[in-house]
Every structure is written in C-alpha cells, then in structure tokens.
C-alpha cells in the first residue's frame, strides 16, 4: 500500500529502491574502511622496512625508536599508532614475514604474503604474529581471518 508524502506517493518500488541505495552506501563504507586499513598497513610495512634498514645501515641501534615516536607524535598529535611499542611491533611485523621469506624461496611469495597481511586489521596482525611460532601457522590464521571475518577474540 502506498503512503502519501507532500505530493509524493511512497510505493513499494520506492522503498525497495531506497533500501538498495542504503545497502550500496553501507557497502561503499565497508570498501572505504578496507582500503584505509590497507593503506595504513602499507605505511606500517614501509616503516618496518625503514626501521630495520636504518638500524642495520646507519647503526642507530634501538634507542632511535623513542625519538622517532616523540617526533611523529609531536607532528601528528591526534593520530594514534606512533607509540614506541607500536613502532617496535611494526618493526617486528615486517621482520617476522620478511625474514621467513628465505624459507619460501620466492620474492613473489613475499609479495603475496605482504598483500595477505595488509588485508586484515592491524590488531589482528599483532595478535597473530605474537602468538604464532611459524610463518605457516601465521598465514593459516591470516587466511582464516580473511575467509571468515574472524574477530581478534577467535
């Protein structure tokens, strides 16, 4: 049954159309969130690589992470993710998968791994990398998280 709104008759067709628009908006929001997450993790991957390289090549040791954290937090005060602990986690995350690439004997496999781990949220990545003993075990949980939309509590 149609209802009237100031010169407009609301039909079932209109309601279905609005429902479709709402669903498309929600899907766009989800896609945007996934893309934002991927870009953030892409940044984290690059930061991890840079931290590892600076520690090896510039011989800065571990203490520069505290200064790096202060500098980034000062420049981006409202942005989380640049604490000393998180920067250390970012470094560990990069090393965990990068160091294990020798066992996989393929650069293309590392790129596949990189794309996989960037497809799940940072909190999930942290939980997986700290709990798993091997890259195979970690990738199992990354894949299951992607396939089943697992939360961190699983």
Locations of regions flagged by a protein language model:
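Basic, low-complexity intrinsically disordered segments
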Residues: 1-154
């Amino acid at each position: 049954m149609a209802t009237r709104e100031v010169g407009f008759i609301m039909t079932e067709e209109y309601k279905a159309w609005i429902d479709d628009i709402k669903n498309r908006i929600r899907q766009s929001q989800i896609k945007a969130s996934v893309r934002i997450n991927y870009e953030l993790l892409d940044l984290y991957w690059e930061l991890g690589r840079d931290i590892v390289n600076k520690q090896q090549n510039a011989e800065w040791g571990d203490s520069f992470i505290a200064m790096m954290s202060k500098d980034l937090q000062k420049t981006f005060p409202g942005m989380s993710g640049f604490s000393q602990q998180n920067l250390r986690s970012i470094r560990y995350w990069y090393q965990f998968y990068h160091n294990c690439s020798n066992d996989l004997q393929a650069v293309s496999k590392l790129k596949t791994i990189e794309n996989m781990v960037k497809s799940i949220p940072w909190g999930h990545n942290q939980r997986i990398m700290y709990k798993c003993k091997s890259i195979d075990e970690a990738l199992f949980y990354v894949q299951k998280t992607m396939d089943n939309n697992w939360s961190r509590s699983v």
